[in-house]
Amino acid sequence: MNTAETAHWINRLLPGQPEFHQVGAFKVAGYTIDDESIACSVDFGRVNTGLVTEAGAETVDVRSEILSLARADVSVPGRAVGAAATMLLDASLSFKSATDSSVTPMHAQPGQILPCVGIMANLPQEGFSVVHGILADPRIWGPEIPYVREEAGQVNVEAPDEAGDLARLTLPLQLILLTEEEFAIALNEGSDVMFERMAEQEVDLLDLKR
């Protein structure tokens, strides 16, 4: 999908009327609902982080748009989304240009940890306690995650993206911002343990000053 098509799709998924902002190299749609806000990229799908999935005998290219929720001004999750997208783009470019195997890919997929993404978004400087991030399946639509599938040969792209020979799936991916303590648990004990403890403690993920 191109940017206009993606923006139309995202707008059908999220409530209210969006305000679009350019955050670094990425366009982000912002939605405000009472005291909560949602920000979602609409052109991160052009970034190929190397993620594919096997659908039977078929290999499918997987792309995503990054969303983040907060109980704060919409510019706050908007900057976080832009920082996450930039980090993943930079990692993708570094991996593609690497001349040895020491550089590991950073896929846009659930469980991917994004160290210091909050710092990139200037969040601690504004009094927020979240410093890092992790990508996760979004649950705001319940157990089913919306997606768009484009068949091979019918993938609509914008430069510098290339359609390639594969079918493509585009899905939303949630950026959850983490405190230093939560980040340490994810690193040392795994993201599943971290999320279990957060659920047990009824952590409010929208409270970025927790």
Regions found by a protein language model. Name each.
Residues M1-R46, A55-V62, R71, S75-R210:
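Acidic, proline/glycine-rich low-complexity IDRs
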Residues T49:
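Short, conserved beta-strand/beta-arch hydrophobic-aromatic motifs that form part
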Residues L67-S68:
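Extended, charge-biased low-complexity segments
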